[in-house]
């Protein structure tokens, strides 16, 4: 990973960071989770692209609002942030763009995957809804404080359920990765599995910290590199160990 890019990644107040040092028409955009991370250090995540030349973009949801308030430095709403991020990608000459995200960042990757018309999205243990009714129905009591803050001051244009986007025609190819035995993560994934372009990959282990587990089993790098190389069958990069 470019040294300047790594240094910028380590600045937690940065809403977005871009590395255009590669001469490439492929870009990867990683969306940080509620704590701004990816379960593993961001520089380590990007390094898993290996020798593939790729423009790298990392965004953080500094408002801890499932990207409902946009991305600081790019725009204060979903639509304005998407427009700015599209300009960044266009300026980099990106013809193929793959989004990645973990947990709340997975929500962001799917959300912006549709807004930006990305080619492919890989969401690890993502939330697919954050509305009160569904959280009560599924008994999802996680992240109570940021959820309450979002409800107290809901932004215009909020998207609290990704299912309609995922079931609509068009949109990116979406790969959702979850631990098959994690009740809540599985429930979030099951709700969008009916989308024609959605594939759910149920891994044997990892819990909600699935990204770290996939890294440790050498599956994460294969997933990332396979996505950047182009569409294909992910069966050969699923984890082999529990």
What role is predicted for each listed range?
Residues 134, 138-202, 208-212, 221-238:
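The feature captures the conserved acid-bearing segment of alpha/beta-hydrolase catalytic domains
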Residues 101-115:
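Glycine-rich nucleophile elbow surrounding the catalytic serine of serine-hydrolase chemistry
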Residues 64-72:
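Glycine-rich "HGGG/HGxG" loop immediately N-terminal to the catalytic nucleophile
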Residues 71-91:
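Alpha/beta-hydrolase active-site loop
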Residues 2-54, 58-65:
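Short, surface-exposed "cap/lid" segments of acyl-processing enzymes
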Residues 50, 112-120, 191-195:
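Short, surface-exposed basic-aromatic patches at helix termini and helix-loop junctions that form
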Residues 123-134, 181:
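Active-site nucleophile loop of the alpha/beta-hydrolase fold
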Residues 93-103:
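Alpha/beta-hydrolase fold nucleophile elbow
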């Amino acid at each position: 990973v470019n040294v300047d890019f790594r240094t910028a990644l380590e600045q937690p107040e940065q809403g977005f960071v871009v590395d255009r040092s590669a001469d490439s028409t492929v870009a990867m955009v990683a969306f940080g989770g509620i704590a701004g991370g990816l379960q593993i250090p961001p520089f380590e995540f990007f390094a898993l692209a290996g020798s593939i030349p790729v423009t790298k973009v990392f965004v953080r949801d500094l408002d801890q609002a499932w990207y409902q308030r946009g991305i600081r430095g790019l725009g204060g709403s979903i639509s304005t942030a998407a427009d700015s991020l599209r300009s960044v990608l266009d300026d980099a000459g990106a013809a193929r763009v793959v989004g990645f995200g973990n947990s709340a960042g997975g929500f962001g990757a799917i959300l912006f995957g549709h807004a930006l018309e990305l080619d492919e999205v890989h969401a690890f243990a993502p939330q697919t809804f954050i509305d009160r009714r569904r959280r009560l129905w599924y008994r999802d009591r996680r992240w109570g404080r940021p959820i309450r803050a979002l409800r107290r001051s809901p932004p215009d244009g909020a998207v609290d359920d990704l299912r309609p986007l995922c079931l609509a025609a068009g949109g990116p190819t979406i790969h959702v990765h979850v631990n098959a035995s994690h009740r809540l993560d599985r429930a979030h994934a099951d709700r969008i599995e009916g989308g024609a372009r959605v594939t759910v990959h149920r891994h044997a282990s990892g819990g909600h910290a699935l990204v770290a587990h996939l890294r440790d089993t050498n599956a994460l790098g294969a997933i990332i590199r396979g996505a950047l190389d182009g569409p294909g069958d992910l069966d050969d990069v699923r984890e082999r160990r529990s």
